[in-house]
Amino acid sequence: MNNKLYGIILCFLLALPAWKLGKFFPLVGGPVFGIIIGIVIAILLKNRAKFDSGINFASKKVLQYAVILLGFGLNLQTIISVGSSSLPIIVSTISTSLIIAYILAKLINIPTKIVILIGVGSSICGGSAIAATAPVINAHDDEIAQAISVIFLFNVIAALIFPTLGDILNFSNKGFALFAGTAVNDTSSVTATASAWDSIHNTGTQVLDSATIVKLTRTLAIIPITLFLAVYNSKRSSNVNNFSLKKIFPMFIVYFILASIITTVCNYFIEVGVITENISITINNVFSFFKHLSKFFIIMAMVAIGLNTNIKKLILSGAKPLTLGFCCWFAISLVSIGLQKILGIF
C-alpha cells in the first residue's frame, strides 16, 4: 500500500480545492474542476513515477467506492412511488440517447468506449453514470475525461437556457420538473436548473423536489445498463465459449444495489416507527455522510483522471465527441418535450 500512498495523498489534496470550487460554482461542479486541476498539475508534476500507482488506484478503485456510496442516496421506495409516473418519458429519453449514440458512432467513426460513456452519461446521470460504466468497459482515463467534459458543457447550457425555454413553452411546475429531471444530465445541474425555476416562479422547492426524484429514478438505469455492458464487453473481448457471468460481473454494482436496499429498508423502518427518533437521526446522518463522501470520491477520482489525461490528445479528438454529446442532449430534450405534449402533462 505504501507505494500507492503518494499518489492517493496527491489526489486527495488536489480534490479539496476542486470540491470547494464546486460549491461556489455548482453549474460547473467539483468533478469538472477536479479534471481541470489534475490536467494542470500533470503538466507541472516532476518525478511522476512515485505517484503513478496511487493515481491509478484513485482513478479506478476510488471511483468504484464512490459508486457504491452513491447507493446510500437512493431510497427505492420513494423513487418507485413518486417516480413511476415519469417512467414512460425516462425510458424513452434513455432509449433515444443510446440509439442516437449508436447511429452516430457508425456515421462519424467515434471510438466505441467514448460513444458508450457519452451515451450513458447523456441518458442516465452524467458523471455518476460515467463513473459506474468506465470500470465495466475498461475505459482509458483520456476517454473518461473527454466524456465528462462533453457532458459538463451541455449541463451548463441546459441550466442557463432551460428555465427561459420552459417559460416560452408555458410549462407547468410539474411539466418543468419532469423536463429538468429527464433532459438535464447531471444531478448537480438538475438541481441548479430546477432551483432557478423555483426562484423565478416563487414555488419554494416544489420543482426541485420533483425533478430530483425523476433524476434519481433515471439513476436506477445504471444497474441494468452496466450489467449489460459487462456481459457485452466480456463476449467481445474473449472467447464466447469461455464466457462466465461470475467472472465479469461488476461486484461494485452489487454493492451499489445493496447500499440502495439498506437505505430503503432503514427509511421504511423509520417511517413506520420501528426505529426510535434518536437512532433515526443517527442513521440519516450516516447516510448523509456517505452521500457527501461519494461526491468527494468522484472528485478525487476525476483529479486522478485529469493527472492521467493527455491534454494534446484530448483537444485534437474533441470535435466528434462534442457532436455526439450535442445530438444526444438535443434529442433527449425534444423527446421529453414531445412526449409531455402528447401526454398532456404541460
Curated annotation (Swiss-Prot):
Is Transmembrane given among the entry's keywords?
Answer: yes
Annotated S-S bridges? none
Q: Which Pfam families match?
A: Cons_hypoth698
Location(s) in or outside the cell: Cell membrane
Which residue spans traverse the membrane? 5-22, 27-49, 62-81, 86-108, 115-137, 147-169, 216-233, 248-270, 283-305, 315-337
Chief subcellular location: membrane
Give UniProt keywords alphabetically. Answer: Cell membrane, Membrane, Transmembrane, Transmembrane helix
- Descriptive protein name: UPF0324 membrane protein FN0533
Origin species, per record, is: Fusobacterium nucleatum subsp. nucleatum (strain ATCC 25586 / DSM 15643 / BCRC 10681 / CIP 101130 / JCM 8532 / KCTC 2640 / LMG 13131 / VPI 4355)
